[in-house]
Amino acid sequence: MKTVFEDREFASEIGLSAVNSINLARILAQCVYYISAFFRLPENEREDITFVVPTGNFGNVLAGWLVQRMGVPIKGFRVATNQNDILHRLFETGIYELEEVAPSVAPSMDIQVASNFERFIYYAEDSDADKVREIIQTFKKTGKYVFESLDRAGFSSSRTDDDEISRIIKEVYLKYGYIADPHTACGFAPVLNPSNHSQFSGKEIVLATAHPAKFPDTIDSAIGQESTHHSLEVLKSREIVKYSVEPTPEAIKAFMRKHVSQV
């Protein structure tokens, strides 16, 4: 899809845009709920705040970091990954190294190359575009980049595998009566782990990412019941429509041209 977006003539032809975090407007929209969460706290509890953010493509947590740069006094951020833990390994070791994607029960975090991390690097490297280009080109060529002095800028990280996710969903449900989806469970994991408590003072705010009804099998396995949502229940009675498209830029563009012309 990045190749498709880079074809500016095609993008202009069909009015192509994106609603995922490739589009900076998405990141800016996500800034809002960090500010909202901050002001929902009592005034005397707004110091030493750490946001715990389930993270795959680094977009959500980047929004929070930008809010911090805007002046909201957020202490830091914990990047909560699943078993696809390239960002956890980065913040632990300073090494950004590609591995095979391991499919998980938290599929939106099944990412090895976090595209929004480039945006963070740009600021971390004092807006040195040439340095960012060198880092990204080295990573693309070798699958690895070693940061000599990575400024973690208040970031820490954690990793949660599939077995732990199911356990955390159950623990959160029993303790709080809240049904967490698999991605949100990765955010709860470090908060519920007593060994992490010595690292934090103040408040930890866990960001939820999806409705648990999207993951019925995982939720049922963890707590013995399904979570439902009316908008998803309505879809069950509708006919399934699906298309198969070759995973090439030209095939995707041809598919888009055909279907955009029908709108």
What kind of feature is each model-predicted range?
Residues M1-V263:
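PLP-dependent amino-acid enzyme catalytic core
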